């Protein structure tokens, strides 16, 4: 069922007499539990027209590189296959997404688009809505409770949002049934050059993107791989999640954040799967999946400066400014941080984990961000450095969750703590706390092993390595 609160008409134009209904897929790169896709199918059937799914592949998406594109194309290749199985044609074009959407809209009776929350995604949808000749309808499918339903303003913390979401959760946590298209569109010919992604290496080679950040061997894109990880998490990790999720030397997290970032798996699908499990620890995981993740969507939607130092609350800005004059024992350049060349072996291990795997343990992400603040000339420089490294190397970089996570390291969605040098009233973390709580030697050994394995895996062995989920 698709509730009306998920649906928003973006312009005041009408459905017109054109040959197709078009779904512009952008943030929700999946065929399962995709409200935008199911809405588009429903409208196509009602209008007795075939459905076309369009995806625009640009060389110029901000800060994206080979690592991100490879993972995304692995997922899109699977999407195209699954859509064909459902008799739906998918057109992938090498073009700026909004321009391609506008071009194909000239053939559309109706345009449907999934919802995005970042600045560029909202700009793209506005451009299409303003310039398309037909009605443009946006369907919200990458959160459980729609952002504007959950709250009409930027929330101060998880505490202030949690109750608001809880009150509406049952209303929106409804199963979504797949519909069949009445019209088969797979053999339709449209006057557009399609971008072939069957051979992903070849497709990547033809893109003018940053190829210095290579694909990772530890995660393979696509809904099917996300579902394998989810089943493994539920079966083998969830029962110890609360106890062990913060232990860097162990892997009791779900590994689903890259898949959620690219919309390759639905948070609603995850929630419904967990509702069938009678494990107490699921509450802790659902706090991360729903409250924390949707708090990040609230942050980037309501705060125009979400990727800037100025997004921080006034108390954090004031206290960090007050402590600008404090002496820093260590100051590292961007190059030293990027290459994990600090005096702190724990921090270096976390940075190397990000470089090698495209992910970083959640608890270490907090420590990582706090230390960048401590080791930079100014907190604003630290903020920009953290954003740069996060977006460049993490598979889930450039994500609302990442922007909120970095902001948290500097005081966002947190409260003032005891005052100390450099940090002021911002929460402090140090290596002694890590050593006291966790098996950090084992964590460092784990990352060293990853580095060694990554170095010796040949191209011929990649397929085998990727199957070891």
Where are these regions (language model features)?
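Alpha-helical packing segments of well-folded alpha/beta enzyme cores
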Residues: 36, 75, 79, 226-233, ...
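Trp/Phe/Arg-rich N-terminal binding region typifying the photolyase-homology
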Residues: 1-176, 281, 352, 371-376, ...
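Glycine/tryptophan-enriched, flexible segments
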Residues: 146-312, 438-469
């Amino acid at each position: 069922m698709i509730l009306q609160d998920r649906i928003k008409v973006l312009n005041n134009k009408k459905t017109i007499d054109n040959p197709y209904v078009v779904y512009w897929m952008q943030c929700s790169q999946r065929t399962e539990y995709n409200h935008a896709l199911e809405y588009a199918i429903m409208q196509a059937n009602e209008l007795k027209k075939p459905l076309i799914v369009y995806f625009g592949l640009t060389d110029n998406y901000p800060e994206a590189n080979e690592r991100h594109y490879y993972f995304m194309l692995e997922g899109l290749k699977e999407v195209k296959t699954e859509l064909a199985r459902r008799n739906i044609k998918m057109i992938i074009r090498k073009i700026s997404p909004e321009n391609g959407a506008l071009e194909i809209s000239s053939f559309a009776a109706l345009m449907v688009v999934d919802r995005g929350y970042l600045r560029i995604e909202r700009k793209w949808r506005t451009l299409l809505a303003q310039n398309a000749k037909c009605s443009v309808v946006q369907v919200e499918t990458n959160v459980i409770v729609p952002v504007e339903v959950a709250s009409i303003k930027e929330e101060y913390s998880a505490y202030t949002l949690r109750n608001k979401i809880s009150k509406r959760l049952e209303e929106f946590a409804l199963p979504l049934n797949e519909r069949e298209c009445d019209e088969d569109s797979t053999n339709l010919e449209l006057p557009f050059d399609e971008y072939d992604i069957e051979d992903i290496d070849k497709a990547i080679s033809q893109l003018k993107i940053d190829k210095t950040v290579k694909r990772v061997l530890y995660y393979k894109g696509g809904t099917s791989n996300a579902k394998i990880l989810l089943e493994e998490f539920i079966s083998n990790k969830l029962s110890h999640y609360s106890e062990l999720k913060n232990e860097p030397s162990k892997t009791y997290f779900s590994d689903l954040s890259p898949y959620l970032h690219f919309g390759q798996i639905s948070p609603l699908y995850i929630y419904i799967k967990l509702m069938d499990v009678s494990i107490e620890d699921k509450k802790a995981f659902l706090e991360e999946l729903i409250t924390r993740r949707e708090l990040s969507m609230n942050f980037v939607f309501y705060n125009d400066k979400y990727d800037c130092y100025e997004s921080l609350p006034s108390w954090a800005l004031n206290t960090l400014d007050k402590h600008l004059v404090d002496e820093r024992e260590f100051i590292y350049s961007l190059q030293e941080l990027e290459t994990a060349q600090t005096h702190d072996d724990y921090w270096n291990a976390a940075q190397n984990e990000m470089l090698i795997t495209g992910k970083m343990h959640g608890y270490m992400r907090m420590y990582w961000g706090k230390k960048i603040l401590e080791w930079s000339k100014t907190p604003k420089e630290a903020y920009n450095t953290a954003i740069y490294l996060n977006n460049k190397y993490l598979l889930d970089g450039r994500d609302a969750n990442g922007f909120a996570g970095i902001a948290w390291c500097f005081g966002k969605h947190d409260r003032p703590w005891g005052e100390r040098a450099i940090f002021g009233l911002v929460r402090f973390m140090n290596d002694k706390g890590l050593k006291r709580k966790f098996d950090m030697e084992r964590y460092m050994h784990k990352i060293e092993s990853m580095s060694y394995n990554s170095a010796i895996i040949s191209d011929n062995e990649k397929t085998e390595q990727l199957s070891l989920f």
